[in-house]
C-alpha cells in the first residue's frame, strides 16, 4: 500500500540534484540559484547557491513550525500557490553560515531542478531513478493543486519495499545492477556531515547530524545514514553492516 514519505522526500531530491549535475543541467553545487530563478538574481538572495539549499544554510525566512496554523510550512501543506510562497521568502541570515532546517530550501531545489532540466520533478525522478531500480509499483508525488507543482519537500508516495530500494541505491553509492545511477563522487560528499556550519538548534556547535538532505547518527558504534519523515517514516542505512 502507498505511504507518504513526508520529509524523506528531501533525501530523494538530493539524489536528483546529483543526477542533474552529472547530466550537465547544473554546473556545480556552487552555481547560484539566481541562474535558474530570476527572483533570486538580485540582492541578498543572489548569494544563495545550490549547495546552500542542499545543506539547509540558505538563511531564508521560512517558518518551519509544524504546530502553528499560520507558519510557512502550514501554508505549504494546505495552500495552492507553493511556488509563490517559496519565491517570496527573504534572506535573514548570511547564506552558508548556519544549518537551519527549512522545508523551503528543498522546495527551491525542486524549482531549480525543473527549470534546469525542463522537466517536472516527477518525470525526472521517473527517468533517472525510479525506472532504473526495479521499482515494483508506481510512485505518486502530491501537488499543490491540479496541474500544479510537486510538494518536493514532502509527500512522495510509494510502498515500503520501494523505499528500501532507495536505501539500497545509496548503500551501493549510486550503483544498481552495475549501472551508476547517481554519481559516486556526488554521494561521497553528500553523505558527509556539514561540520563547517553552525547548528542553530544545538547552540551553534558544528553540524554533525546533517549533510546534503540526509541525516546522520551513531548506533552501537556504527554510523547510520537516514532519511526521515515527521511522522515516523525512515530509510536507515548502516554501511558497516551492509
List PLM regions with ranges.
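Active-site SXXK
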Residues: 1-29, 53, 109-113, 163-169
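Active-site helix/loop module of the DD-peptidase/beta-lactamase fold
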Residues: 4, 23-61, 88-90, 116-153, ...
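Non-transmembrane alpha-helical segments in soluble domains
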Residues: 18, 34, 51-54, 87, ...
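Solvent-exposed loop and edge beta-strand segments that line ligand/cofactor-binding
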Residues: 42, 94-101, 149-157, 227-231
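Structural recognition of the beta-strand scaffold that forms the well-ordered cores
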Residues: 52-55, 100, 137-141, 155, ...
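Active-site Gly/Thr loop motif
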Residues: 136-137, 188-241
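A conserved catalytic-loop motif detector
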Residues: 168, 176-195
